[in-house]
């Protein structure tokens, strides 16, 4: 009986050690990548927020996921082709719910000012390395500690350039689990680990479709890398990943997921 109790306590402890990252804020309940979503994430006790970054035509760091504004604001123009003044005119909330009508697209500078003490922001670079100089300026002006930040990207060159510019900030290589159209094969872990090590990234941030189990996580961590997963909105999947030893889980529902992991 004592052994069973100790085993249960160890499992609970491993679950609670998992960092919960709010995907584009609390995006299940509020419009993604808006101040409303970020504030709600903190209310739901998220450990961190994840947000996406593009450069506007005039060089501002815009918090937005898609390359264009059609899905969110009904405007089929690329963020990179819009000035910041034009971006400010877009309604980023009505598509989600009428109560969010008029919600605006924020800048990174603004979001960084709202992060509570002890929490952090995970910044996803959506474009090329040209974003790095402005990112350097904004992060320096924010006075945020490197411990309050992490940077992620699917774009290897962008992430590499960022890693070289911000050696004190954790960097994670994003990767999906889809078949290569040319070979028909799924990606393999070992080459991915090798790339991350060569670029001196701090870890991998993988889609939960990867065959993640205890052995998988051990292989990543034995290579000196941390292991993050996205985007998990299923309690059973989250519990499996937590028990396997992942460091963080990204979810659209941070408050709900924390309750499920109790």
Q: How should each PLM-predicted stretch be described?
A:
Residues 9-14:
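Hydrophobic core
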Residues 1-8:
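Sec-dependent signal peptide recognition
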Residues 15-262:
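Phosphate-group recognition and catalysis centered on beta-loop-alpha active-site segments
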């Amino acid at each position: 009986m004592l052994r069973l109790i100790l085993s249960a306590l160890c499992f609970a402890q491993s679950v609670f050690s998992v960092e919960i990252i709010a995907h584009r804020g609390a995006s299940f309940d509020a419009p993604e990548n808006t101040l409303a979503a970020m504030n709600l994430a903190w209310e739901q006790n998220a450990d961190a927020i994840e947000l996406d970054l593009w450069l506007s035509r005039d060089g501002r760091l815009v918090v937005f996921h898609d390359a264009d504004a059609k899905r969110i604001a009904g405007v089929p123009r690329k963020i990179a082709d819009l000035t910041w003044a034009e971006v400010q005119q877009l309604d980023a909330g009505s598509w989600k719910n009428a109560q969010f009508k008029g919600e605006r697209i924020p800048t990174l500078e603004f979001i960084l000012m709202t992060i509570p003490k002890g929490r952090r922001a995970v910044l996803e670079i959506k474009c090329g390395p040209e974003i790095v100089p402005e990112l350097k300026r904004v992060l320096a002006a924010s006075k945020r500690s490197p411990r309050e930040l992490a940077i992620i990207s699917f774009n290897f060159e962008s992430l590499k350039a960022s890693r070289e510019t911000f050696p004190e900030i954790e960097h994670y290589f994003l990767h999906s689990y889809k078949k290569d159209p040319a070979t028909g094969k799924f990606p393999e872990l070992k080459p991915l680990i090798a790339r991350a090590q060569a670029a001196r990234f701090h870890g991998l941030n993988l889609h939960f479709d990867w065959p993640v189990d205890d052995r998988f996580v051990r292989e990543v961590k034995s290579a000196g890398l941390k292991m993050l997963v996205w985007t998990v909105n299923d309690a059973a999947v989250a519990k499996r990943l937590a028990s396997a030893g992942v460091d963080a889980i990204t979810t659209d529902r941070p408050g709900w997921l924390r309750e499920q992991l109790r």
